[in-house]
Amino acid sequence: DYTKIINGRNPIVAHEFLGASVEGKDVIIVDDMISSGESMLDTAKELKRMKARKVFICTTFGLFTGGLKKFDEYYENGIIDRVLTTNLVYQTPELLSKPYYINVDMSKYIALIIDNLNHDASLSDLLNPTGRINRLLAKYRAGER
């Protein structure tokens, strides 16, 4: 419902889980960004209520506009196990020091994108990992590890 704005944002009316049982399973919550993190934390709490074993939060842009206190609390209470965000936005030293936080370094991929664009090359090989996966599998099968 985009007609209501509360505290400068559209509130989430409901989260609906449509999959099979998550009981005893590790679950990954994926979103484009963490602003306050409220919706991801609500989802994590619901997954734990549904008896998920571990909950991992993964996002591209971790803004953490509401601070880290609630994430600390959820980690300490066993609701979330890890939070992963990329280094495509500034990460505070406080965030980087959290035991539950994993920094996903995207520097290599940004450099490859810039290089391809500067050489007027296609980005499709960067975006489609099939070739890289097949090469890794071939090396693995050949005994190279």
For each feature predicted by the language model, list its residue ranges.
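PRPP-associated nucleotide enzymes
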Residues: 1-145
